[in-house]
């Protein structure tokens, strides 16, 4: 989610937009990121955490690839909105998973989640920086897709369904 603000100027130039238009696109994407979290409690109970997180990562992977090949404002906007919606799955699902999985060490588990979340937030602008420095804005989204392709098998292997398993002792 932090890729777009880091590349406002490049997006303005590439799509011949002004700052307000890019801000509007990011605002809509951010809104979708927030609102997309709402149905997750129902979907969590129906499908479980592993399926939802894998679905989220697959969606982020393909949406990021769509953003990376965007040649029009419409395609960029719609694929970014999809990216925001798929990304919105993570927080409600992972926090619920933590609360169901850990008994004694829930605070420690949430702390680890927060640390890695902060790393993720700081990686967005860093990925943008190196992409813009050495390639183009498109590559920031390609790298995001690659990262999700790398994380996907790890999620499939290590995310439990919902059994209690306090593993951070």
Where does each model-flagged region fall?
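Cytoplasmic helix-loop-helix junction between adjacent transmembrane helices
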Residues: 80-117
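Extracytoplasmic
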Residues: 1-19
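Conserved MFS/SLC helix-loop-helix module at the cytosolic interface between two early adjacent transmembrane helices
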Residues: 35-71
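Paired small-residue
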Residues: 63, 74-82
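Residue-level signature of mid-helix packing/kink "hotspots" within the transmembrane helices
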Residues: 2, 30-38, 121-122
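Helix-breaking motifs and short loop linkers at transmembrane-helix boundaries and internal kinks
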Residues: 16, 48, 69-74, 103
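Helix-loop-helix hairpin linking two adjacent transmembrane segments in secondary transporters
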Residues: 112-159
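Flexible cytoplasmic inter-helical loops of multi-pass small-molecule transporters
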Residues: 156-169
